A protein has these predicted regions:
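N-terminal cap/lid segment of alpha/beta-hydrolase-fold proteins
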Residues: 27-66
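Short substrate-entry loop that stabilizes the transition state in hydrolases
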Residues: 67-69, 77-113, 204-206
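The conserved beta1-alpha1 loop
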Residues: 73-79, 198-199
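Alpha/beta-hydrolase active-site loop
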Residues: 119-140
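Alpha/beta-hydrolase fold nucleophile elbow
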Residues: 142-152
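Gly/Ala-rich beta-loop-alpha elbow adjacent to hydrolase catalytic centers
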Residues: 151-155, 159
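The feature captures the conserved acid-bearing segment of alpha/beta-hydrolase catalytic domains
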Residues: 172-226
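C-terminal catalytic histidine-bearing segment of alpha/beta-hydrolase fold enzymes
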Residues: 221-268
């Protein structure tokens, strides 16, 4: 499968979102970069779904080998998909190569970004996340009861706080570099597994303390929250940090979205 340089990925993503990606570029694999990468047996294409009468476009990754029946939605940060696409892409490819269906939506198409954002903005973004999860559950090869949602920074807050709402059908939620400094937590209550990931490399405003405040809030609202601190000493979101983030992400998704392995029969 043809490989594109990392610098080309953001351009490919932007082209796909505007309907200009050719079949060849949509299926081009991202460069490998982590020590545990598997062969890139996955495709990338463009798709769209509707949230509150707004069309939301995104990138859809599918396994070319056997699907595992699970799916995950990846939500970008406040910088937008055009900035985060090059960081997400190789890891979305790796998830798909392992059997997951993966959607990376441009959820700002459901509600344009403004600074500062307000409660209505956050609510509409959360509802776009709900719609993305529901959309993934309609795809062939996906069990609608095994769809998770993941987000980075603002996207992490939208994914976790939004999934605590009764309207969400996400089976699990993961937030990376997020906390209550993003926005005031909502009041919805829902029981589901969540994981919050924090490290030295996340934005200064998102400290471990504010992440733990969000974890405590989500627990009070019914979630079972795992807190994972990154081991990497890197002070920026380097490739090494992203590898560690997605290693923890895959472990959590596998544990909560995939069937437990059958115990081996006793010898003899």
């Amino acid at each position: 499968m043809k490989r594109f340089p990392t610098s080309a990925i953001a351009a490919i993503a932007a082209a796909a979102l505007f309907g200009m990606a050719s079949n060849a570029s949509a299926q081009a694999a991202a460069p490998a970069g982590c020590s545990d990468d598997v062969p890139q047996r996955a495709t990338r294409g463009n798709t769209e779904f509707v949230s509150n009468s707004q069309t939301v476009r995104g990138l859809l990754y599918k396994p070319t080998g056997p699907a595992n029946g699970a799916a995950v939605v990846l939500l970008h940060s406040s910088e937008g998909l055009s900035v985060d696409a090059h960081s997400f892409d190789p890891h979305a490819i790796q998830l798909a190569a392992r059997g997951y269906h993966v959607l990376v939506p441009n959820y700002f198409e459901a509600r344009a970004r403004q600074v500062p954002w307000n409660g209505r903005d956050v609510r509409l973004w959360a509802e776009a996340g709900h719609a993305a999860v529901a959309y993934m559950g309609t795809l062939e090869g996906v069990d609608p009861a095994r769809v998770g949602i993941w987000g980075f920074s603002l996207g992490g807050f939208v994914a976790t706080d939004g999934s605590a709402h009764p309207d969400s059908t996400a089976r699990v939620a993961v937030g990376v570099g997020t906390g209550q400094d993003i926005f005031e937590a909502s009041r919805g209550r829902r029981e589901l597994p969540m994981m919050l990931i924090e490290g030295y490399s996340t934005f200064p405003i998102i400290s471990a303390a504010t992440m733990r405040e969000l974890a405590a809030n989500l627990r009070r609202r019914g979630a079972t929250v795992e807190v994972q601190m990154l081991a990497s000493p890197e002070r920026s979101m380097t490739g090494q940090v992203w590898c560690e983030v997605f290693q923890h992400t895959r472990r959590f998704l596998d544990a909560n979205l995939l069937p437990a392995a059958a115990p081996e029969a006793p010898a003899g």
